[in-house]
Design a protein with these regions (language model features):
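Flexible, glycine/proline-enriched loop segments at strand-loop-helix junctions
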Residues: 92-99, 135-138
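Post-Walker A alpha-helix
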Residues: 146-147
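Conserved lysine of the Walker
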Residues: 143
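Short N-terminal helix-initiation segments at or just after the protein's N-terminus
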Residues: 64-75, 97, 177-187, 226
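Glycine-rich, often acidic-flanked micro-motifs
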Residues: 2-12, 16, 21-23, 27-30, ...
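Conserved short hydrophobic interaction patches
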Residues: 33-38, 108-111, 153
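Long, basic/Gly/Ser/Thr-rich N-terminal segments
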Residues: 1-96, 293-295
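N-terminal pre-Walker A segment at the start of P-loop NTPase domains
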Residues: 97-120
C-alpha cells in the first residue's frame, strides 16, 4: 500500500501542491527530509501527482518498458496528463535507487516551475531575520566560500546555486529545490567545524565526494554543522555581486553584462528588467563582501 507526502511550492501568490506517493516508506522519508521546509501535512487541492514504485515485478517492468523513458540507474520514468502526473518504476530497491528517483522528481518539479513567472540565478542565497542576501558571481569568484561564511555568522541556508526568484508586491523573493552544495576542499578548510564533521563522517549519508576536488553536502548537512535552518520563500533585502576582476568600480555597461550572464533561466521579461533595475552591490574582494554580510 502506498503512503504519501505533500509538498507546497509557493511562487508569488500561487501555490503548487505536489503529492508524492511510494510503496517504500524509506524513500518517502528521504523526500520528507529533503523538502523539509516545504512539506505540508495534507491537502485536498493537489496539482501534481508523483508516484515512485520500487521492487516491482519483472512482468510489470517489461510491459512498461516501451512506454516509459529510461533514466538514472535503470529507472523507468514517464509523465502523463500534461505533465501533471509523473511515474517512476524500479525493478530493484536500494538507497542508491532512492537517491536517483529523488533526483528525477526534483528535475521534473524544476521543469514545472519553469512554466511559472520565475527567474533562476547563478548565485548562492542566505537569509536572516532581516531578509535574504543573494550572492551572485562568476565561477571561482568565491560564492560558496562567502555562503559558508554567512552560515557561520548565523544566516540560514536558502541555496548554494540556482535559487528561484519571483516578484511579489514589487519585491524579489527566493526559494530553492534541495540540491547538494558542491564545496571545494580549500573552502572547507576555512571552517574547522565543517572540516571536522566531514572527516569524522558525522553525517556520511549526506556527503558525497567527487573527482573534481569538491565535497557535495546536502542542505541537512550544512544546517547540522552550523546549527541553522533551511528556509524558503524569503524576501531578498540585498544583492551582492562578488567579482575578482574589477580594479575600480564597474560602470553601468560592464555591471549589466555581469548580471545578465549569470541569469540561467527567465521566462518573464518584466522579471528580468526588474532584476537589472535592482540595486546590486559590487564587491571586488571576499573581504569586502564579508563586510556587507555583517552590515
Amino acid at each position: 500500500m502506498n503512503e504519501y507526502v505533500f509538498i507546497n511550492f509557493n511562487v508569488g501568490h500561487k501555490s503548487i501542491i505536489a503529492c508524492i506517493g511510494s510503496n517504500e516508506n524509506s524513500f518517502l522519508s528521504l523526500i520528507s527530509d529533503a523538502f523539509s521546509s516545504q512539506i505540508v501535512s495534507y491537502s485536498h487541492n493537489v496539482d501534481v501527482k508523483i508516484n515512485a514504485s520500487f521492487d516491482i515485478s519483472l512482468t510489470h517492468f517489461n510491459s512498461a518498458f516501451n512506454d516509459y523513458k529510461s533514466a538514472r540507474c535503470g529507472l523507468l520514468v514517464n509523465s502523463f496528463k500534461n505533465d501533471m502526473h509523473f511515474e517512476i518504476l524500479s525493478l530493484f530497491n536500494s538507497n542508491e535507487l532512492h537517491k536517483a528517483a529523488f533526483r528525477e522528481i526534483r528535475d521534473f518539479i524544476e521543469c514545472l516551475l519553469q512554466k511559472e513567472s520565475i527567474l533562476t540565478l547563478h548565485s548562492a542565497c542566505v537569509s536572516n531575520k532581516d531578509g535574504a542576501i543573494c550572492i551572485i558571481g562568476d565561477k571561482f569568484a568565491g560564492k560558496s566560500t562567502l555562503m559558508l561564511k554567512a552560515l557561520s555568522l548565523g544566516y540560514n541556508f536558502v541555496s548554494n546555486d540556482k535559487p528561484f526568484l519571483y516578484l511579489m508586491n514589487s519585491s524579489f523573493y527566493a526559494f530553492s529545490l534541495p540540491v547538494s552544495a558542491g564545496i571545494r576542499y580549500g573552502s572547507i578548510s576555512m571552517f574547522p567545524d565543517l572540516e571536522y564533521a566531514i572527516k569524522k563522517q558525522v553525517f556520511s549519508e549526506h556527503v558525497e565526494f567527487s573527482t573534481n576536488g569538491r565535497v557535495h553536502l546536502t542542505p541537512r548537512a550544512l544546517c547540522e554543522v552550523f546549527n541553522i535552518d533551511y528556509v524558503n520563500n524569503v524576501k531578498i533585502k540585498k544583492f551582492i555581486f562578488l567579482s575578482t576582476s574589477y580594479s575600480n568600480k564597474p560602470n553601468f555597461k560592464s555591471s549589466s553584462r555581469s548580471i545578465e550572464r549569470n541569469v540561467l533561466f527567465c521566462n518573464d521579461r518584466n522579471l528580468f528588467d526588474a532584476l537589472m533595475a535592482s540595486s546590486i552591490i559590487f564587491c571586488k574582494s571576499y573581504e569586502e563582501a564579508v563586510i556587507e554580510l555583517e552590515r
